[in-house]
Amino acid sequence: MLLGQPAQKSEVDIVLVALATPVLVGVYQDGKRIETIESHKKTSDILPSIFQSLMKQYEIKSVYFARGPGSFMSIKLVYIFLKTLQIAKGITLFGCDGFEFTDNQPIKAHGSHYFVKENDTISTKKLEGDGAVTFRLPDSIDEIRCSQENIAPLYVLPAVKV
């Protein structure tokens, strides 16, 4: 390193799960998680500051993100935010369905309705009990199935009874 030149930033991948509270962000180097960020703030409030901080510290190569199902507004916000980063910074995006981060457990939809995944089909079902699911970040990026081709939001809207 020459005097007066900034130190080279480490290249990392990011995993983002913002389908519910808390928002989870994992920083991965060589495929292994080296840092975890968890926030109970609104996605719209915390996402820009998290990524601003990460971009100061690291060179982000790619972002793996839960594209749904879950909070409709959060899904939309995350997609627009990450798509902007992809265009502006050349960051590669990988979309994952949210069940990759719940060990295929139901994801809260609304009231007593939950998103469930059976035979690769996502639907809504009414379930008894609190059904609180805990999202988790994998220790290794190799543990999740994501696609670079399928990054569009995964909106699964429950049927509304009239």
Question: Whereabouts are the PLM-identified features?
Answer:
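Short, well-ordered alpha-helical segments
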Residues: 41-48, 79, 83
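Short glycine-rich anion-binding loops that position phosphate/pyrophosphate groups of nucleotides
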Residues: 21, 68-69
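Histidine- and/or cysteine-centered catalytic micro-motif in compact active-site loops
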Residues: 66-68, 98-99
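Phosphate/pyrophosphate-binding loops at sites that engage ATP/ADP/AMP, CoA/4′-phosphopantetheine
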Residues: 49-62
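DPxDG-like acidic metal-binding loop motif
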Residues: 62-67, 73-93
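Oxyanion-binding and handling regions
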Residues: 1-46, 56-57, 88-162
